[in-house]
């Protein structure tokens, strides 16, 4: 059986790892062992933080919507409840964008949410009306 020399393959793998470690500080950018460990860890952080980014942005959108809605005299929870009762299905990212860039349109959304909340309050029977005194 012929002898297999792996110099070319090993060199290519090392080169690939060092390319990924560009911009790292100290030995981790130019020694294979340290670079490989640093690159592996950086990939774990990247995987984790792709998940965290979704949470962080949702929280940011909610804060922005809450601030804009409170200026209109509602709370975030009541606003979202009113939108769902009014049958308006807009996600939080778009609501946040509308609140920032198109305040007139956002005010109309708040008004329709308030209207839906008032309408349902008027049509819902009171639980204590039939209670015996």
From Swiss-Prot:
A Pfam family assignment: Ribosomal_L20
InterPro entries in the record: Ribosomal_bL20, RIBOSOMAL_L20_CS, Ribosomal_protein_bL20_C
GO cellular component: ribonucleoprotein complex; ribosome
Domain of life the protein comes from: Bacteria
Keywords tagged on the record: Ribonucleoprotein, Ribosomal protein, RNA-binding, rRNA-binding
Gene Ontology terms, MF aspect: rRNA binding; structural constituent of ribosome
Gene Ontology process terms (BP): ribosomal large subunit assembly; translation
Family from the record: Belongs to the bacterial ribosomal protein bL20 family.
Function as written in the Swiss-Prot or TrEMBL entry: Binds directly to 23S ribosomal RNA and is necessary for the in vitro assembly process of the 50S ribosomal subunit. It is not involved in the protein synthesizing functions of that subunit.
Annotated protein name in UniProt: Large ribosomal subunit protein bL20
Species per Swiss-Prot/TrEMBL record: Bartonella henselae (strain ATCC 49882 / DSM 28221 / CCUG 30454 / Houston 1) (Rochalimaea henselae)
Species lineage: Bacteria, Pseudomonadati, Pseudomonadota, Alphaproteobacteria, Hyphomicrobiales
